[in-house]
A protein has these predicted regions:
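Secondary-structure capping and boundary motifs in well-ordered enzyme cores
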Residues: 31, 51-58, 96-100, 265, ...
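Polybasic low-complexity intrinsically disordered regions
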Residues: 2-5, 74, 78-81, 91-237, ...
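Amphipathic, well-packed alpha-helical segments that form the structural scaffold of globular domains
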Residues: 36-44, 125, 277, 281
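Alpha-helical support elements that line or immediately flank enzyme active sites
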Residues: 58-70
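An N-terminal domain-cap segment
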Residues: 38-57
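Helix-centered, glycine/charged polyanion-binding patches within enzymatic domains
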Residues: 3-9, 214-215, 220-295, 299
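Charged, often Cys/His-bearing segments associated with DNA-binding zinc-finger transcription factors
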Residues: 1-33, 37, 319-322
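A short, flexible helix-boundary coil/loop motif
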Residues: 260, 283, 316-322
Length: 322
């Protein structure tokens, strides 16, 4: 892409911003060729009558920018107009037209319609395996709550029918759950299954396993998972956290201390499952569902976890700095 005078502005020696450093790292670690190959068969080709589509690489980059910076379609369009760094990452020159919010929306719907978000997570993980990242040892399962708007002040005067409320501790939440299965050693997400918030964690355990693990770790919400019918053929050992009441019921102090040490060990292994949640919620700002319905939000969450995997191992993937 040829530089214009607008593009050349600010290319002199100056401090690199955190945004520029982050995007430079993502430029190197995202498997662009594999992702573009997944989407290309479904993306409209140029040369037909009418307005020509934007380059697929540009639209994919804009879509990923939306996930990293938690931007809506209108906000993404405005950010491309205002922020030179984002425009440069999207490969839009100073004289190029910026995709409007409807074009950005249509690209996201194309990914949702063809179920490409799940395949993007698979493509990212396959690329990480090729680069030496483990994704086939033990699995840790857990779920996080994602809030949804509980107000009925909208056109339908109703809440999203696919979202439900649940109680955690003494607090009530309305929204959905995002259960995930992560690798025991690397902490990378390999399976995601979004559900309504009121569905018990243990009911989707089978959907979070890849089938080759030798151990499964989970908190007390997964008690009895190994006895469920859909997991009878699973040969992995289940290491589920004991409930506090079970530990307190042990009368012998020595046995109780031994059981507590065992629980501490299991908790230290399970800690890795919290890292992807931190990345998507704190690093990428995903604290509330953006769309109505589980299908659209599941596609969004799948993309976020694919990007969180890349973010967590970016240091190992980047070339060594001298």
């Amino acid at each position: 892409m040829q530089l214009t005078f607008g593009d050349a502005e600010g290319l002199g020696k100056r401090k690199q911003t955190r945004c520029e450093i982050f995007l430079a790292e993502m430029e190197q670690v995202v498997p662009w060729r594999h992702l573009l190959g997944l989407i290309a068969p479904h993306y409209p080709v140029s040369g037909r009558p009418g307005r020509q589509p934007y380059a697929l690489a540009t639209m994919l980059r804009i879509h990923l920018l939306q996930q990293w910076y938690a931007l809506s379609d209108p906000a993404m369009e405005e950010a491309l107009h205002e922020i030179r760094t984002l425009r440069r990452f999207a490969r839009l020159g100073g004289l190029d037209n910026v995709p409007d919010e409807t074009t950005i929306l249509n690209f996201r719907r194309l990914l949702e319609t063809h179920g490409l978000a799940a395949r993007m997570l698979e493509a990212v993980n396959a690329d990480l395996v090729r680069k030496g990242q483990s994704l086939r040892s033990g699995t840790i399962v857990d779920a996080t709550l994602i809030a949804a708007p509980s107000s009925t002040k909208n056109t339908d005067c109703a809440r999203d029918p696919e979202m439900h409320q649940t109680k955690k501790g003494n607090q009530w939440y309305f929204g959905m759950k995002a259960p995930i299965g992560v690798d025991e050693f690397s902490g990378l997400v390999h399976h995601v299954r979004c559900t309504a918030a009121n569905l018990a964690d243990v009911t989707v355990t089978h959907a979070l396993l890849h089938g080759k693990e030798d151990s499964v770790f989970g908190d007390s919400g997964y008690t009895g998972a190994d006895k469920r019918e859909e997991l009878q053929t699973c040969k992995a050992g289940f290491f589920i956290a004991a409930k506090r009441s079970t530990i307190q019921a042990i009368g012998n102090k020595r046995e109780r201390r031994q059981e507590e040490r065992w629980e501490y060990f299991k908790a230290s292994v399970r800690a890795k499952v919290e890292h992807p949640f931190r990345v998507i919620k704190r690093q990428f700002g995903y604290t509330k569902v953006r769309y109505r319905g589980l299908a659209k939000n599941t596609a969004h969450v799948l993309t976020l976890f694919a990007l969180s995997n890349l973010w967590m191992v970016r240091r190992q993937l980047l070339p060594a700095r001298g």
